[in-house]
Amino acid sequence: MATVFWDRKGVLLVDFIPAGTTVNADRYCETLKKLRRAIQNRRRGMLSKGVSILHDNARPHVARQTVALLQDFGWKIITHPPYSPDLAPSDYHLFPKLKEHLAGRRFSNDEDVKDEVQRFLKDKAASWYDMGIQKLLQRLQKCIDRNGDYVEK
């Protein structure tokens, strides 16, 4: 499994999680620490300007330990309703295209899969990532306009 953190300019971090690993608060906090280092290296000045992170209510995301770590980082948590893939940019923008790209391919080992995922993400222009974030703004506005009622494509 891969956890991908990205913004309108591109990928910040891809954290590949070994098969069979349970993602609990400890594991997720380690990933967030990696993300913070990635932001320091890839987006100079972003940490001082402020970071917002979009989270659903999965247990590792809302665990006391995770919330405390994000507060220590000074990051703003943006939540979205549970079971709302229409409001999760990775679910409606990134993963469908990645799945399409990988469809029908055969890989001899996990490293080959990881390499191909990294290659796919690296080959996307900043404008592609920006489009995913812009779609979020449009989808959120639709949700607001409908007083929170379900929005289909």
Question: At which residue positions do the language-model features occur?
Answer:
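Surface/interface recognition patches
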Residues: 1-153
